[in-house]
Amino acid sequence: TLYPLSPPMKNSAAPLRRFLLLATACCSTAALLAQNPAAPGNPPGGARGPMPLGEVKVLAQFDKNGDKVLDATERAAARESLRANPPARRGGPGRGRGPATPPEPGVSLTTADVKSYGSEGLYDPSTLRTLFLQFEETDWEKEMEEFHKTDIDVPATVVVDGKTYKDVGVHFRGASSYSMVPTGQKRSLHLSFDLKHDKPTLLGFRTLNLLNSHEDASFLRPVLYSRIAQDYLATPRMNFVRVVINGENWGVYSSAEQFSKEFAQDRFGTAKGARWKVPGSPGGRGSLAYLGDDSTPYKAIYEIKSKDDGKSWAKLIQVTKILNDTAPEKLEAALAPVFDIDSALKFLALEITMVNGDGYWTRTSDYSIAEDAKGRLHVVPHDMNET
């Protein structure tokens, strides 16, 4: 029997906790689930609500030739505009948590200094690939700081296993993994191999998420979580890579598989199903609470990653309504056709067992939702860097 770590929160009614009643013979994890908002718009604990979703749209204003990539001149104009009119957005240049040792340059590395791999997959746990990023500008870090949380990527040439990829889009990713890390220190990166061209991929993948493990000196927590979780539910794969930027070694990053349509096709049998990300936020409200039949309040919480249409939102709203309004004795029969109960229970067990400090059961945020080929919704772990 698994015993709860804390008593039930007063007035707690997180929807996923309701169907945990179905498994009380096996474990009593219900008390650990995150507190549901007392009313739509009011997150747990009196927080101010989730941070704004999405990114500041700037690209179209400066992309004069419409190629989706800003050249050096276009980026310079965009940077000047952003300095003069800084947008309201989440996060700013990383400041860290206090005095830090001034960063020192990493050692120089070339392609001749590292091992190249052949047929091994991108997320093969036995590999430690080296990614060489070459930016046009020497102040690439300052440039990416100024474009953080906008829709502008800084283009780079990337060399992996001796193969060259041009016009790869790069930007800093993350919330606390960005804002809590000072300039000159390792920050998480997002690489888009299809920024300008539709076909280029790195070993079949269009996107790389390189995480700095800013709260984990061992670098092992998210990778171990991923390895364990893959035995029980659909989970992004992870391993390690080394990153060299403009000839300077920036060290090892954990590399996480993108929650993409390719991920959905591989795990759920369709690339056409609806997908959502619930962004991380201390005041997250992504508890699957029923907020009415209008999709507007849901769009302030759940960031849709697939086609934004009424059918997708109706599916999500249907699940939340069943979770919140169905009598316990009828809940399993009503929920099973539209929601994978078994994988959700495993997801919750993993969240608790692995002590995820930034997920559903603590913040009702920082997880994903995907629709399978049968029209059922699944919950999917995300990031896993605070376990």
Each predicted region: which residue ranges?
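Phosphate/dinucleotide-binding and metal-coordinating scaffold of catalytic cores
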Residues: 35-57, 79-387
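Acidic carboxylate motifs that coordinate Ca2+ or other divalent cations, activating on Asp/Glu
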Residues: 63-67, 71, 358
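N-terminal acidic, proline/glycine-rich, low-complexity intrinsically disordered segments
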Residues: 10-12, 32-38
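Bacterial N-terminal signal peptides that target proteins for export
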Residues: 3, 9-23
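Ca2+-coordinating acidic residues in Ca2+-binding motifs
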Residues: 74
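Short, basic, low-complexity termini and linkers enriched in Ser/Thr/Gly/Pro
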Residues: 1-4, 34
